[in-house]
Amino acid sequence: MTPTTFAALLSKIRTGRPLIHHITNAVTINDCANVTLCIGAAPVMAEAPEEVREMVAMADALVLNIGTLSRQQVGAMLCAGREANACDVPVILDPVGAGATQMRTDSARMLLDALHIAVLKGNAGEVGVLAGADAQVRGVDFLGIGSDPVAVARAFAEDAGITVVISGATDIVTDGKRVLLVDNGHEMMGRLSGTGCMAASLAGAFAAVADDHVVSSAAALAAFGIAGEKAAAVASGPYSFRAALFDGLAALRPDDIVQGARVRVL
């Protein structure tokens, strides 16, 4: 679990161009597609229930994001997720806004129960709510959690048998046994809508080329954070930062990860 390992995964993405099937939200769908392209993978954004089984069968990872939820979309997620499980395609779930409304919380829990999720990625509030901790969410924003987020993530991951990612100033990645802390990133990333969704897309791209999803998730977050740091150095505000972030991901080299990844083992 060294930066060299993370860099090798980036090289595998660029060489293999894995197909990442998204069922995601209307607010950030274009950003998710573009961030997937910039890292070197291929996005497809299909969510019609009539076609998702066929599409996911040819994919290398499936990213589910409940940001703009509907009953039809949840049905499509179930169809796609079951096919992904049958085809051994890793599933990444981003439970956007879980804890804000009962529908979001129930839908996220149902997907966790019905599917084998490889990676659950959310903020501390979303993950805390799903783990049964005392957490507060307003809209899609995290307000607070009454417990240590590392302990919450670790216990939840071990109990559910999944990799849990909590995004924040320091990202937490754990499977219940191992805990990695990723310190890369910049505060400007929190001032731009959709960076959490983009992180889930990158988690899908890296999961597509790795069996160890603790390593792949940490690699995705380190790569995203390094690109964010580089973007902040040249941006004058949130929207120029957005453009620089995409440019930074597209220009990211394996050596940038080797030299720039700041990851700690807890």
Predicted regions, residues:
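N-terminal glycine-rich anion-binding loops that anchor highly charged ligand groups
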Residues: H21-N34, A46-M58
